[in-house]
Amino acid sequence: MRLRWTQGGNMWLGVLLTLQLCSSLEGQENSFTINSIHMEMLPGQEVHNGENLTLQCIVDVSTTSSVKPQHQVLFYKDDVLFHNVSSTKNTESYFISEARVYNSGRYKCTVILNNKEKTTAEYKVVVEGVSNPRVTLDKKEVIEGGVVKVTCSVPEEKPPVHFIIEKFELNVRDVKQRREKTANNQNSVTLEFTVEEQDRVILFSCQANVIFGTRVEISDSVRSDLVTVRESFSNPKFHISPKGVIIEGDQLLIKCTIQVTHQAQSFPEIIIQKDKEIVAHSRNGSEAVYSVMATVEHNSNYTCKVEASRISKVSSIMVNITELFSRPKLKSSATRLDQGESLRLWCSIPGAPPEANFTIQKGGMMMLQDQNLTKVASERDSGTYTCVAGIGKVVKRSNEVQIAVCEMLSKPSIFHDSGSEVIKGQTIEVSCQSINGTSPISYQLLKGSDLLASQNVSSNEPAVFKDNPTKDVEYQCIADNCHSHAGMPSKVLRVKVIAPVEEVKLSILLSEEVESGQAIVLQCSVKEGSGPITYKFYKEKENKPFHQVTLNDTQAIWHKPKASKDQEGQYYCLASNRATPSKNFLQSNILAVRVYLAPWKKGLIAVVVIAVIIAVLLLGARFYFLKKSKAKQMPVEMCRPAAPLLNSNNEKTLSDPNTEANRHYGYNEDVGNHAMKPLNENKEPLTLDVEYTEVEVTSPEPHRGLGTKGTETVYSEIRKADPDLVENRYSRTEGSLDGT
């Protein structure tokens, strides 16, 4: 019975409200109170599935009225209202017929009287167990490989329900198949079960698990009706021919047969397997046949499988073949031989009958129809050898023997990819190669006496090694292969390594300050470099070297025996060798050289300079006084010839060039120098007044005492110019040589 409002619930609610209104009007005159309220479950709070359950709500009400008041009773399950009633009775009941799991829950009831309300505590009700499920089948007879649909349901319960369906063989307790499924929206499931080839009479069981909140109630397991299974084809059977002992060489016949019922829609596939190998099969009949000449290789377990869609039936048999003769054995004197050694092979059968035929083969090709083979080995004899022995139709192949004939290596050649010279640090490839000889070939490269690297080559191609030599080095390689001879050494490869020029430096051997006349020695050196090295010496601001030399040395010297001021300046040098890139000379530092004079030379030069200065001064002074003297005499001679002043020896008396008697204020040396110039030298017209002044000069005689005096009269010409012009005068002076 569903716990919810009926469709007439609204009507009942109206009636209850009306009754409550009336009660309230009456209550204005009477007093009411709810003393207590509680619930009772009959037969109890725990009931079994399918039992009836009664819910009672018991109310104790007190009133001043002589008539019992009408009150409202409401029933709740898990806080959801499912039933209400108006009553004047103290007890109201709600009946549940055949309680199920979903009726489990927490119940309570509420009483409403006028505006007063009281609710009971919650009462937990548990319905234990699940009603038994129902199992139905879509058929009770089925053919092998068919499908049976099984439906399991619990109509009385509400979902979700978890169903477990199991398949059993009749009278067998073990479960053949088990399947589970949960129905979330219904209380039944339908599952399909395939009928297998071993099934004869089968049945199914069903169990329902009802999930309610956190609780799960499990039903009893209910079995279905029996299902009869019919065969679509029989189990396969083997037929072996010949019967009894089968000897190698006999024709072996293996046949697998089945019987197909009329209910089968088509023939199944029949497969014969030797171990896992399929040797015969058939799809259009009731048998499959495998026929072959018997050998011991056919000793095996044979399986016959019959398969049709979902059905597979299997049968097995062991077939034994008696050996006619043993497998031949091939042996050799050695498996690795040097070229030219003797190769011997022999084939044998333990207890072989005389009629056995032998053939020795190499790589599947016949070499000799005999039991033994002897020959001188060559490299082309390398390969895989077998022996074939036959008696009648039975042919057997021996084990394989791998023969390797090794040709001796030729002397290996050694070479590298660069020229005769290698620049330091450059990677070179050194190759070793033996033209003749059996591969694989093992090469070892020696650098000096040390092993540099090893390499295995699977052909006669050269082995290539890489190295970065930093100095002159010798390489040698050793080649070896399978031959018993020791490793074959090559000739020695000598590689000359050229070190590029590094760190060019220019220095002076004595001092950067050189005394004039002493030697200058410049040294251009390199830290490292292979000769010959070209050195070029430069003076700064000069495009061409003043000295160039090529040496097999890491230094070069330029020597100047006697230095002069011309050698003073800044110097640098360039150096290069064959390892230097084209036009890429390395430049040194710049060196400043100063040339100074020797002290004695400085003194000599000073003396010479002083002497020259003195000489120049003397010459200048003499020239000056001579010029001055001429300037004094020249105007007098132009006026009249003056009588020479004679001393006591009748010699002319000359004025002392150092005297200052004739130099007086107004004297113009230029006038004296130019006294010979004509008057019309000046282009402008001049008005001149000429006066003559008598000058008496007294000069002492150099060879007489100061008391002796001489007098000379000199006439000077005085020209007067216009006032605008400069006035030149020649004053008349009288004096004596003694200055008085």
From Swiss-Prot:
Residues 28-602 are extracellular. Residues 717-732 have a biased composition (Basic and acidic residues). Residues 622-740 are cytoplasmic. The chain crosses the membrane at residues 603-621. PROSITE patterns: IG_LIKE (PS50835). It is found in: Cell membrane; Membrane raft; Cell junction. The modification Phosphoserine is found at S731, S736. A motif (ITIM motif 1) lies at residues 690-695. It holds the Pfam family Ig_2. Residues 711-731 are annotated as: Membrane-bound segment which detaches upon phosphorylation. Residues 1-27 form the signal peptide. GO terms for cellular component: anchoring junction; external side of plasma membrane; membrane raft. Trans-homodimer (via Ig-like C2-type 1 and Ig-like C2-type 2 domains); trans-homodimerization is required for cell-cell interaction. Forms a complex with BDKRB2 and GNAQ. Interacts with BDKRB2 and GNAQ. Interacts with PTPN11; Tyr-715 is critical for PTPN11 recruitment. Interacts with FER. Interacts with CD177; the interaction is Ca(2+)-dependent; the interaction is direct. The Ig-like C2-type domains 2 and 3 contribute to formation of the complex with BDKRB2 and in regulation of its activity. Phosphorylated on Ser and Tyr residues by src kinases after cellular activation. Upon activation, phosphorylated on Ser-731 which probably initiates the dissociation of the membrane-interaction segment (residues 711-731) from the cell membrane allowing the sequential phosphorylation of Tyr-715 and Tyr-692. Constitutively phosphorylated on Ser-736 in resting platelets. Phosphorylated on tyrosine residues by FER and FES in response to FCER1 activation. In endothelial cells Fyn mediates mechanical-force (stretch or pull) induced tyrosine phosphorylation. Palmitoylation by ZDHHC21 is necessary for cell surface expression in endothelial cells and enrichment in membrane rafts. Residues 35-126, 145-223, 236-315, 328-404, 425-494, 500-592 form the Ig-like C2-type domain. GO terms for biological process: cell surface receptor signaling pathway; cell-cell adhesion via plasma-membrane adhesion molecules; immune response. Residues 723-740 are annotated as: May play a role in cytoprotective signaling. This is Platelet endothelial cell adhesion molecule. Keywords: Cell adhesion, Cell junction, Cell membrane, Disulfide bond, Glycoprotein, Immunoglobulin domain, Membrane, Phosphoprotein, Repeat, Signal, Transmembrane, Transmembrane helix. A motif (ITIM motif 2) lies at residues 713-718. The modification Phosphotyrosine is found at Y692, Y715. GO terms for molecular function: transmembrane signaling receptor activity.
